[in-house]
């Protein structure tokens, strides 16, 4: 699709699944998890319009959401995205953490949403946000089948 250096983000590299587990583990109140999602979303760089044009706008989401990807020569996938909603940006950040730098086979072997369950995030999502998150997961799986 596009050169990944233009769609860099810290998720899956600097911010790892282990980082998120350690961050969310002490949070028992949904409001605290919500705040943490907003903070994660702030770390997600906004996509320039030219990358939004190359990325796929995901239907079924509460807010506008774009998801794109590239595949490195070693077969590892780099995903990037953006959203107009603060919470959705945070959810996208968690999703990018879960899928960044994995091969298509690795992504097909485990649900991209498994990390959300580990962090206790899916249970409190509204129906529309859950639907949007599922649409993002389906888009990732669809991307792995095109590799």
Curated annotation (Swiss-Prot):
Coiled coil (UniProt feature): none
Modified residues (Cysteine persulfide): 61
Active-site residues, Swiss-Prot/TrEMBL: 61
Single Gene Ontology BP annotation: cyclic threonylcarbamoyladenosine biosynthetic process
Recorded superkingdom: Bacteria
UniProt xrefs under Pfam families: SufE (PF02657)
A GO MF term: sulfur carrier activity
Annotated InterPro entries: Cysteine_desulfurase_CsdE (IPR017763), Fe-S_metab-assoc_dom (IPR003808)
Disruption phenotype: Cells lacking this gene display a high decrease in the level of ct(6)A modification in tRNAs, and show the t(6)A modification instead. They also show no defects in motility, fitness or antibiotic sensitivity, in contrast to csdA mutants.
Subunit structure comment from the entry: Homodimer. Forms a heterodimer with CsdA. Interacts with CsdA and with TcdA/CsdL.
Record PANTHER family: SUFE-LIKE PROTEIN 2, CHLOROPLASTIC, SULFUR ACCEPTOR PROTEIN CSDE
Function description: Stimulates the cysteine desulfurase activity of CsdA. Contains a cysteine residue (Cys-61) that acts to accept sulfur liberated via the desulfurase activity of CsdA. May be able to transfer sulfur to TcdA/CsdL. Seems to support the function of TcdA in the generation of cyclic threonylcarbamoyladenosine at position 37 (ct(6)A37) in tRNAs that read codons beginning with adenine. Does not appear to participate in Fe/S biogenesis.
Family: Belongs to the SufE family.
Entry protein name: Sulfur acceptor protein CsdE
Organism this protein belongs to: Escherichia coli (strain K12)
Lineage of the organism: Bacteria, Pseudomonadati, Pseudomonadota, Gammaproteobacteria, Enterobacterales
């Amino acid at each position: 699709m596009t050169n990944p250096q233009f769609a860099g983000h810290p998720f899956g590299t600097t911010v790892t699944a282990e980082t998120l587990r350690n961050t969310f583990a002490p949070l028992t109140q949904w409001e605290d998890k919500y705040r943490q999602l907003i903070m994660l979303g702030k770390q997600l760089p906004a996509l320039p319009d030219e990358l939004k044009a190359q990325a796929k706008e995901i239907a079924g989401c509460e807010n506008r959401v774009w998801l794109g990807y590239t595949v490195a020569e070693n077969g590892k996938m780099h995903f990037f995205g953006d959203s107009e909603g603060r919470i959705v940006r945070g959810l996208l950040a968690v999703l990018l953490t879960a899928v960044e730098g994995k091969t298509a086979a690795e992504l097909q072997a485990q649900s991209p949403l498994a990390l959300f369950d580990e962090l206790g995030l899916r249970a409190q999502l509204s129906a529309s946000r859950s639907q949007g998150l599922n649409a993002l997961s389906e888009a990732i799986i669809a991307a792995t089948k095109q590799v």
